[in-house]
Amino acid sequence: MTETKAIGAKTDNWDEGLPLGNGFMGSIVYGGNPLKITVDRTDLWDLRPNETTLESGFSYKNMIRLVKSGRDEDWREYRRLFDAIFMEKPYPSKITAGRIEFEFEGCRDIDYSLDMRTATVSVNDGAERIAEVFTDYVTLVGVVRVHRECSYKLNIPDYLSGTEGTCEGDSLSSRVTFGYPPAVVRERDGFLWYEQKTHTDYRFGIVTCRKGNEIYYTLATTDDDGDYIGYAKKRLERAAEAGYEKLHAEHTESWRKYRRRSGVKTGDRLIDGTYEKCWYLFRSCSRKGFYPMPLQGVWTADNGSLPPWKGDYHYDTNTELSYQAYLKANRIDEGEVFVEYLWRMKPEFEKFAKTFFGTDGIIVPACSTLDGKPMGGWPQYSLSPTMTVWAAQSFDEYYLYTGDIEFLRTRAYPFFRGVGKAISGIMEEKDGRLFLPLSSSPEIFDDTRRSYLQPNSNFDLALIRYL
């Protein structure tokens, strides 16, 4: 498949736009005139912990007690401690950074198309090409080349600095805001950017640089450098010195090499097209040395709200299934970031096993922040210990496909041993058999009392037997 077009001539909906990504930064191209280009990155987070997770009652032992008591007041306390925390405050959460809006002179009929071979979006006004956009896979910056006079501005989400926005996901909707100081927009020497302070030392902003008919952009944070704006400007200047043609040639070559690693042709246009799109999206939002894809990958809903489900890591098979097929498809460079991340988070997972479950070993919060901490949510899965086994299986599969004995010795076995130690540490013996004190299956019976199944669910049983 050579290219796929947006639905209709144009779309005003962000979730019908065309996705671009380089495994670090993502953009969605949508709109008309103005043309909208979102700017996001996986690691843009407000990582302040919800204070409820620091209470002494936020523990597995207390959760068991509250579930089994049968009293309404205890169930309300259970909901307060473990469920309501997901949406009662805007943090911790992925952050929406905003977008760049382009106004073209005399545009009447804008549409756009995505060439997946080159990961490039072409923008047209009728039969005339007016712009191209790509997120460079080599330099990690966004690049726009325009062929018609245009102006552009930055659109910053209102909910960041005090105007309430909608918090979506987990069947709840409330008015939320981070309450940050208003962002400061600045323009100087061909650069346009904004600076956003938060309630900690963390800061971020979209930075753009214009050189003739080429506009370069990035999203920088204080994780990059204390002088994150200066850091971003230097990156953009280097990209601008190279120029569109050179960057695009190297970017296209990297995608050509990726596509050559494997391919499937069934003769069915729908199946083949879906296959191409899936592996295009996979590389767009996953790459070695960075973070694995959370719920929305490198993109975030551009609707003036917190990301759906706060853009977290959902280990109730959401995250795992995103990486289910990369080994068979020979996409190891892009896929192994998942096991690398889990290993890097091992100390945090060991801490969670100890502080929440009261056991030694490794347990992964099934609804997790970027830095591996619990977010709460429906406790039946967000705080289920067996979700960890799904995550651990990725180590098993990596070893089986690569045959890497050193990986087995230094990564897979230690991780599995830690998970096994933790799971066995919380199980209870009855009549010569081991049972989990609480057992569920993801999202069956939602977040009601019925969702705890007796004695143990097939879901939990299958995972524990595998372990």
Cite the ranges covered by each PLM segment.
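A conserved hydrophobic secondary-structure block that centers on an alpha-helix together
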Residues: 126-141, 160, 392-414, 418, ...
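The feature captures the catalytic groove of carbohydrate-active enzymes
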Residues: 143, 297-312, 359-409, 423-467
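Alpha-helical support elements that line or immediately flank enzyme active sites
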Residues: 145, 281-284, 319-333, 389-405
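Extracytoplasmic/secreted proteins, especially bacterial periplasmic and envelope-associated proteins
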Residues: 246, 250-254, 266-273, 277, ...
